[in-house]
Amino acid sequence: MEKQFTLKKLVIYLSCVFVALILLSLLALSVSSHKTVAAFYGISEPNQKNIQAILQTTSIKKNKKKEAYHFVTLDSSVSLKKALKAAGTPDLLFIYGGLNADYAASVSAQKKAGFTTDILNGMYSNIRQTAKIEKNKVTAVPVLVDHYEIDVQRAKFESSSISQINLLSDLEEFARIAKSSTVGPVIFAAGNDVELINVFGALVEAVSGRKAVEAGIEKIRKTVSVGKTSQSSFYSLLLELTSQGGEWHEAAELLKHWSKINILPKNIYQMQKNDVRAFLESNLSVVAFMSLSDHRSLKRDIISRYSSSFIPGTAINVERNLTAPVIYAIQMKKGKQAHSSVILLADSLQTSLCAKTGLAPVQKNCPTPDIQSDDVRYLVAASGVPLPMLSESAFTNKPNRTAFAEALRTILKD
């Protein structure tokens, strides 16, 4: 009986040891096969794929094997804070500048995962100033520059009596001339909430300057902070901003005027990006407002008919702060792989990154793939510190953007 009991204890002991060994093996396998996680928030699918392709080349060797990245797309319909709570904190985050990027930079600072300021070496000064720095550590590193632009149909422009489009009045005159041969001379995706907000924000800067943009943003943030996020609340705020004497009055009046003289199509506030693409493909418009990212998404045989430029203002020789959204790489946790990758992306891989994405570099001297990305670099460098997208600097989630955009459409249609 005693022998049986001893044998039973031995079997139990050996079983426990066996289970422990299995658990240790699984843990070791998990650690050895861990992939550094790179996440994307609010970055278009084409830009994600192109950044991923370059990022994967930066993988460092571990146990004689390259440690590949694991990629995650975060839910950008909610705030970044909520998205991270749902998906977990990645090692590395790519994000456009704005409120959510500010939050990510604060997380990086808490984790003490930033970079020394020499990571900004070689960047043009206006871009260096967009970097997020806390306690002498760079927590948000600029790696690419997007840009809100106008695309002008060359054939119609060259056959017109307009020699240059230096001012919005030149653009309007060109559109008037082209009105008889087009359905809508001037277009943008005003049915898309984000595009409406961002193009409108870019126009506010163009006609009223940076201070007007920032004053409006401050009022929006205060409204949101007290929970007034309904369409009617935003409508009341926009009435104040766009009324005579309001910070955004001139931009709103400009779009209303363009609608009145029929250089915007009648369905402008229903137009989506696909509609803009169709109009350009069929030569139904001569000027389109869009981002460089969207410019790159168009087929070459379509966009080759158009020349891109910055959105002009109402006066020459006035300092501009162009709406040129910066994409940041933010290290969210300490780790050799992510740290090494960001250093490469911000410097030696700039040419590859720009060639793959078609966006502008942050380095002042690196070669660029074509004239568009080089022009954006030059324009931003020659202007004041670039502004982020209004949709990102004023809001953190989709519901608030949607409510605001609906209120803005109502204002602009009045």
Report each predicted region and the residues it spans:
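Extracytoplasmic/periplasmic substrate-recognition and gating elements
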Residues: V287-M290, D294, K299-A360
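Short helix-initiation/N-cap motifs at beta->coil->alpha
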Residues: V72-K82, S169-D170, K266-E281
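Hinge/lid segment of periplasmic solute-binding proteins
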Residues: G97-E149
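Conserved N-terminal structural module of periplasmic/extracytoplasmic solute-binding proteins
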Residues: M1-N100, L353
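Extracytoplasmic/periplasmic solute-binding protein
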Residues: F174-S236
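Glycine-centered hinge/linker elements that transmit conformational signals in sensory
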Residues: A215-Y269
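C-terminal capping/gating helix-and-loop segments adjacent to ligand/active sites or protein-protein/ligand interfaces
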Residues: R320-T323, L353-D414
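Paired acidic/hydrophobic, glycine-rich loop segments that form the ligand-binding mouth/hinge
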Residues: D91-I95, S285-S291
